[in-house]
């Protein structure tokens, strides 16, 4: 049985039981999967959770995101710091507004799950990121600035919206104004800023051709 067939069976079943979360036992029994098919079912369910098509609750039950007041999608962060979750499944409600204080450490283009608030400002639908399913980037191109025994990289992509802290041992001999590639070692979480290590020095800001090199490198840093 194909993975696509299993996935469709699960989604059809969940749609018909959307009013409440479903246990693994009920799902396996009602779909009548057995033997290797049952193992394939559990494997596909874990992939669906990872993809944000299903949500696993703390009670070890499964539900559809929209039936639980959740939205799964790619986060688009604006240069002003707030963002929008663009749903994987298009709906009449459209994108979900996320205030900067409710990004919860998520960064531009990450795949996230957000909880929809009951009341948004001015009647606008808004929410809060509650889970980061997939990071879109782990490396960023930016400009290095040193400040004593630490430094930081300001990403060229202004939609990232935050500097990345770098400890002295991770400078890779970078100097003020260097264009660098920095790899995240500690992800932001809403309370703590991102930390990283410099993996490559591209050249000095303003060098001939450095802008083109930086753009190419930045595209190479995309994970998905």
What is each residue range found by the language model?
Residues 1-223:
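Charge-lined substrate channels and their catalytic hotspots, especially those that engage the 3′ end
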